[in-house]
Amino acid sequence: MKTGMFTCGHQRLPIEHAFRDASELGYDGIEIWGGRPHAFAPDLKAGGIKQIKALAQTYQMPIIGYTPETNGYPYNMMLGDEHMRRESLDMIKLAMDMAKEMNAGYTLISAAHAGYLTPPNVIWGRLAENLSELCEYAENIGMDLILEPLTPYESNVVCNANDVLHALALVPSPRLFSMVDICAPYVQAEPVMSYFDKLGDKLRHLHIVDSDGASDTHYIPGEGKMPLRELMRDIIERGYEGYCTVELVTMYMNEPRLYARQALERFRALLPEDER
């Protein structure tokens, strides 16, 4: 089972620490968080991309994906006026360009909250318009775009497997895929494996965390309530061959290396010996 480190937890340290830790601790790849100060797409365009490419080479660490910050600060393609929407889409396009240049396997985005007063027809119309434009760009440059469903604490747009199916049906692009952060279905009493059943080969990536079942908090494996050992057995038996990013975000920023080590060790302990 291939593992990825998410760099968001290292945001108060130089990004080289994330590459170094991923290499030394034994992660198989790295998922780059696209927020300041590390890898904000406009900063990469201004020259920072050279450092990212150099670090990947120095530490021999594959960049499995690039995840620009699209959940509302300051970019959210689902909320605000046309100027705000246009800025968000332009940033995501730039992020795809930067992902292409750093040889990332995908660009991962989400449909953040569309606002409490926005009716469903407006939400889905805006999502379809956004994804159509982004997928056309992705097809033109040869970049896979992954749409991540969020928890209902974070969004009111794409939050479950059926929402993903709806989005994929609205924009049937060969470059559009989805994934599952296993916290999202768990807090909604939705079976994680239903994503595998419903999405098939459109399921491109996994974020592995533990969950308390009552919030969007991402815990290290073993700190929450999820039956992770049994879940990973099912995922392996289903034949999943992609990466599993152990997605530690802001909860563990005070000691990212220590928690990244602990998270990886606990995750691997969940797996059969031949998958570790």
UniProtKB/Swiss-Prot annotation:
Keywords: Cobalt, Isomerase, Metal-binding, Nickel. Its EC number is 5.1.3.41. The active site is at E148, E247. The keyword Isomerase applies. Belongs to the FrlC family. Allows E.coli to utilize psicoselysine for growth. Does not act on psicose or fructoselysine 6-phosphate. This is Fructoselysine 3-epimerase. It comes from Escherichia coli (strain K12). The gene is frlC.
